[in-house]
UniProtKB/Swiss-Prot annotation:
This is Translation initiation factor IF-2. GO terms for cellular component: cytosol. Pfam families: EF-G_D2 (PF22042), GTP_EFTU (PF00009), IF-2 (PF11987), IF2_assoc (PF08364), IF2_N (PF04760). Residues 96-229, 243-352 are annotated as: Disordered. One of the essential components for the initiation of protein synthesis. Protects formylmethionyl-tRNA from spontaneous hydrolysis and promotes its binding to the 30S ribosomal subunits. Also involved in the hydrolysis of GTP during the formation of the 70S ribosomal complex. Residues 452-459 are annotated as: G1. PANTHER family: TR-TYPE G DOMAIN-CONTAINING PROTEIN (PTHR43381:SF5), TRANSLATION INITIATION FACTOR IF-2-RELATED (PTHR43381). GO terms for molecular function: GTP binding; GTPase activity; translation initiation factor activity. Belongs to the TRAFAC class translation factor GTPase superfamily. Classic translation factor GTPase family. IF-2 subfamily. PROSITE patterns: G_TR_2. Residues 443-612 form the tr-type G domain.
């Protein structure tokens, strides 16, 4: 194989490529690099040059040298005695010289020997050739050196240019960094100044608040002092009234001896009893009165009488209270008690009796109330309520809720008047709160709902406005959830609600229409008005909101905008150019045509509506979508319609309540608050609310719990009443229609909108023969309890965009529970429809196969009566059915037992042949009868 390149030829010759290149250059073959290709002519030229330079050109070689090399190994022990292997190389060299066989005669040699002049001429020519070769080599070396020097200079220039460019780049980078540093320092200074200003404002505000708080505390203290002074004055007046002497008319009696009076008086003073004084002592006191000089006697008598009157009041029957109502039997009646304060303690007891006088209260009892709240309403301690309930045989704690009946019984037992509290009206309560706040009404962004038929380009239109790719991410390319977004435009913020267009999502579209200010009705210019377009128009007109029509796909060649306008006019949606009030805009979601004009029309409608809402108020709004997330709990997408929703607010949404733990915007980012017309996701509700429920922010969590409990109870009672009515209706319907097959289903979906849409679509599949029964439908993943319910009800579990957990899958596999997963509502409806079709009883259809005429009748002892027949049309087969006609009247219908021809059993006999036919369990046949043969075929039915 010949070598193709210089490098390969050099390897073959065992030379370096550089040496071979030099030799080729000397031979006049111009090759620059080792990868250049050599041909046979180049090799021949090199060979001729080498032979000429070594003097062997044109002559035979006289001497040849051969070198032989062989290698062998020997083993020899070293000084340590270890054997080592030594390689021995033997080289042999032999030289062979070729000798001439014929030696010419000396005369011939002499004649053939060249002359000295010829030799000199040859030598000079050789010398000239050698000089020319040397000069040529020197010129080539000079040219090569010159090229190398130029290449080296070029590389040096490029290196210098790169170094200069790098230095300039570094200088520019340093200048930019210094500018950025200066800008950052400037921004930091501005920020520090703003922070200092904010701190100063905060300090000033705090000082003002502290001053206001101090003034309020001072006013409160003054008010408290005034109330305390009034209470003390009232108590002093009561005490003075109680201590005032009575006017008593006493008749004169004969005087008694003074010692007796003295003894009576001293005895009275010593005893200090609470009982009335004896008659004798009283007489003595009255007798001693005249002996006293002037008014002194009257004063003593009045004091004694008032003292006895005061003691008498302590013996009156009193109502038991928690105060000391023993009439003076207290610590002062114990031995060793303080003696000097006895009179003061009695005054304190009288004051306490007046202060703790029992008052009958009117206690309003709500649906549920805790023990502590009930005690607070009756102004007593909770332990008294617990004691009363224990007497009634009910063990409770202080925080345990009581029902309304039990609480009213306790109130009556405690001596108060119990009244049923009015039912909580959350809307009125919220309206009362908002009106009490007197919040300022500010302009808000419009809420725009995009509605229309499926695949008319609603989501694609929003994608172009939002510059996102939502439509491609939806399963099946259709929207199955309500999407809420807010978009910032040069003229303000617009909030969009994207509703599904599929017929199953009617409830979602209705919710979107109720929560909106403006409706964008999307209608494809190449498709026209469709059923869901008409439904969207009805929802918008029912909600009373203006309609802006967007004619999508207007850039397609088959678009016919005028035809679509005429169809919409037929649905009472009249464009402005026809004298109506609905602007029509032709748009394209691909090219962006008409998008700006559409937004302009929407904002113009918003300006006409003058949308306003309070900002500094408790938030109110509507729940758009709900779901149950495994890691976050119940999640609700809400649209704030008024007020500001903040993290930490107590939210009441339908039958659920809770404190907002976190808020996320439509991009999944955390946010602290959301104003009017802003959609957010909130977490923290105790359960998953119903989509479409109104939500509101309450100040009191207890109030929110009461309202949610009341709503749940009301909903439960309504649901039970509906179920009972449905059971009665079903019972009467089943009695009238007979046995009806049911297909029990359990539906679990990711969001509530999809769950209710799927349930409604599946219930529509029910027929008179088979009925779809929704055993349970909910939001969240498929749990073990769902599988257990499916086992008990023999239901099929349908998961829409959800999956079963490990325990649920294990339980389902062990009990053969069918769990099916879907992410497109079409597929779920189609498969359930197919399953219902399989449950339908097949349709039996009769198909005629032939006729025969009985020409003779045979009677055999072992077989029975046999009809000798002639097949007039079609054929007769074994085990087919027949119909016996006599005088064109059907006599009997049965089965053919066997068919014989020429004493042989055959499967079938065709037209034009005779055969014997044995009829099963029937022998009453005559000549001339007609037989019709037919088969019953079962055909599968579909819904």
């Amino acid at each position: 194989m010949s070598s193709n390149t210089v490098a390969e030829f050099a390897a073959e010759l065992k030379k370096s490529p550089e040496t071979l290149l030099d030799q080729l250059k000397s031979a006049g073959v111009v090759k620059v690099s080792p990868s250049d290709v050599l041909n046979e002519a180049d090799k021949q030229k090199l060979l001729a040059h080498l032979q000429a330079s070594h003097g062997t050109a044109g002559g035979d070689r006289k001497k040849i040298t051969l070198v032989k090399k062989s290698t062998s190994e020997i083993k020899q022990a070293d000084a340590s005695g270890k054997a080592r292997t030594i390689q021995v190389e033997v080289r042999k060299k032999r030289t062979f010289i070729k000798r001439d066989d014929n030696v010419d005669a000396p005369s011939d040699a002499a004649e053939s020997a060249p002359s000295a002049e010829d030799l000199e001429l040859v030598r000079r020519e050789e010398e000239a050739r050698r000089q020319a070769e040397l000069i040529r080599r020197q010129e080539e070396e000079l040219a090569l050196t010159r090229r190398e020097r130029e290449e080296r200079e070029r590389r040096e220039r490029e290196a210098e240019e790169r170094a200069a460019a790098y230095a300039a780049q570094q200088a520019e980078k340093k200048a930019q960094e210094s500018a950025e540093r200066a800008e950052a320092q400037r921004e930091a200074a501005v920020e520090a100044e703003e922070r200092a200003k904010a701190q100063a404002d905060a300090r000033a505000k705090a000082d003002e608040e502290s001053k206001a708080r101090a003034a309020e505390e001072t006013a409160r203290a003054a008010d408290l002092d005034e109330r305390r002074r009034k209470a003390l004055a009232e108590a002093e007046a009561i005490r003075a009234m109680m201590a005032a002497p009575k006017k008593v008319l006493v008749a004169k009696k004969p005087e008694e001896p003074k010692p007796a009076a003295k003894a009576g008086a001293s005895g009275d003073a010593k005893k200090g009893t609470l009982h009335k004084p004896a008659t004798g002592s009283g007489t003595g006191a009255r007798a001693a009165a005249p002996s006293a000089p002037g008014g002194a006697g009257k004063e003593v008598k009045s004091a004694k009488l008032s003292s006895s009157w005061a003691n008498d009041t302590t013996k009156k029957k009193e109502i038991k209270t928690r105060g000391d109502s023993s009439g003076g039997v207290g610590r002062n009646n114990w031995r060793g008690g303080p003696r000097g304060r006895r009179g003061n303690d009695r005054d304190d007891q009288r004051q306490q009796q007046a202060a703790t006088e029992f008052r009958v209260l009117e206690v309003y009892v709500p649906e549920t109330i805790t023990v502590a709240e009930l005690a607070h309403k009756m102004a007593i301690k909770a332990s008294e309520v617990i004691k009363s309930l224990m007497k009634m045989g009910q063990m409770v704690t202080i925080n345990q809720p009581l029902d309304q009946d039990t609480a009213m019984i306790v109130v009556e037992e405690m001596g108060h008047t119990a009244k049923v509290a009015a039912l909580d009206d959350p809307e009125a309560f919220t309206a009362e709160e908002v009106s009490s706040q007197d919040a300022e009404q500010l302009s808000r962004a419009p809420v725009v709902t995009v509605m229309g038929h499926v695949d008319h380009g609603k989501t694609s239109l929003l994608d172009y406005i939002r510059r996102s790719k939502v439509a491609s991410g939806e399963a099946g390319g259709i929207t199955q959830h309500i999407g809420a977004y807010h978009v910032e435009t040069p003229r303000g913020i617009v909030t969009f609600l994207d509703t599904p267009g599929h017929e199953a999502f009617t409830a979602m579209r209705a919710r979107g229409a109720q929560a909106t200010d403006i409706v964008i009705l999307v209608c494809a210019a190449d498709d026209g008005v469709m059923p869901q377009t008409k439904e969207a128009i009805k929802h918008a007109k029912a909600a009373g909101v203006p309609i802006v029509v967007a004619l999508t796909k207007a850039d397609k060649p088959e678009a016919n905008i005028e035809r679509v306008k005429q169809e919409l006019v037929g649905e009472q949606v009249v464009p402005e150019e026809y004298g109506g009030d609905s602007p029509f805009v032709a748009v394209s979601s691909k090219t962006g045509m008409g998008i700006d004009a559409l937004l302009e029309q929407v904002l113009l409608q918003a300006e006409v509506l003058e949308l306003k809402a309070p900002v500094d108020a408790a938030a109110k709004g509507i729940v758009i979508e709900t779901q149950l997330d495994k890691g976050r709990g119940s999640v609700a997408t809400v649209l704030v319609q008024s007020g500001t929703l903040k993290v930490g607010d107590v939210v009441l949404a339908g039958q659920t309540f809770g404190r907002v733990r976190a808020m996320l915007d439509e991009d999944g980012k955390q946010t602290k608050e959301a104003g009017p017309s802003i959609p957010v996701e909130i977490q923290g509700l105790n359960e998953v609310p119903q989509a479409g429920d109104d939500f509101m922010v309450l100040q009191d969590e207890r109030r929110a719990r009461e309202i949610a409990t009341y709503r749940a109870g009301k909903f439960r009672n309504t649901k039970l009443a509906k179920q009972q009515a449905a059971k009665l209706e079903n019972m009467f319907a089943e009695m009238g229609a007979g046995e009806v097959q049911t297909l029990p289903l359990i539906i679990k979906a990711d969001v509530q909108g999809s769950q209710e849409a799927l349930a409604a679509s599946l219930l529509k599949l029910s027929t008179e023969e088979i009925r779809v029964q929704i055993v349970y439908s909910g939001v969240g993943g498929i749990s073990e309890s769902d599988v257990n319910l499916a086992i008990a009800s023999k239901a099929i579990v349908i998961g829409f965009n959800v999956r079963a957990d490990a325990q649920a899958r294990k339980t389902a596999e062990g009990n053969d529970v069918d769990i099916r997963y879907y992410n497109i509502i079409y597929d779920a409806v189609d498969e359930v429809k197919a399953a219902m079709s399989g449950m339908l009883a097949p349709e039996q259809r009769e198909e005629a196969i032939g006729t025969a005429e009985i020409r003779t009748v045979f009677v055999a002892s072992k077989i029975g009566t046999v009809a000798g027949s002639y097949i007039t049309s079609g054929q007769v087969t074994r085990n087919c059915k027949f119909r016996l006609l006599r005088d064109n009247i059907v006599i009997y219908t049965g089965d053919v037992e066997s068919v014989r021809r020429m004493k042989d059993d055959v499967k079938e006999v065709k037209e034009g042949f005779e055969c014997g036919i044995k009829l099963k369990n029937y022998n009453d046949i005559k000549e001339g009868d007609q037989l019709e043969f037919f088969e019953i075929k079962e055909i599968a039915r579909t819904l």
